[in-house]
């Protein structure tokens, strides 16, 4: 079902047209169901193998849909809420264009008790390539009441898609503002 809808939009992209508004509305309705999101994910995997440039362009035109779905998934139970940041990370939906609504929703998930929500939100945020975004996320995690393992954080920082040296400078500049536990994770990143 998704395949036919998406392939029609890919054909539009191939002819220099935009993704249709009615398609965006269709996705906004259908993808609020986690089962449909899983099917959409599988369809996107195929599309990326077959036509990576068109798949990237297609997703880049879905900004409003992504913001809407971020809000909707944020209201779901924690396991379902954790799934959407995974999709954001997997397809780098906020890479070099951090939609403030999506990034703000990821910050909200960092405050959740669920480690899945927090880890997937951080993974999504690493794809922004934005040092300020990561520093804010680190401060949220550090100020939270839930434990976030330093190894997860140190390894995650290596996934940052932006300039690692610039991130290192930001971390060094604010190092003293963080708890000893957070400093350990930061030191692991800085050593690499």
Describe these PLM feature segments.
Residues 78, 129-130:
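Membrane-embedded alpha-helical core segments of multi-pass
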Residues 76-77, 113-115, 144-150, 178-179:
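Short inter-helical turns and helix N-cap capping residues of alpha-solenoid HEAT/ARM repeat scaffolds
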Residues 24-31, 60-73, 96-110, 131-142, ...:
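Amphipathic alpha-helical scaffolding segments comprising HEAT/armadillo-like alpha-solenoid repeats
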Residues 74, 111, 126, 142-143, ...:
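Alpha-solenoid HEAT/Armadillo repeat architecture
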Residues 1-75:
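N-terminal topogenic membrane-targeting module
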Residues 65-105, 114-123:
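Structured extramembrane domains adjacent to transmembrane segments
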Residues 42-46, 50-60, 82-94, 119-128, ...:
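Structural detector for internal amphipathic alpha-helices that build alpha-solenoid repeat scaffolds
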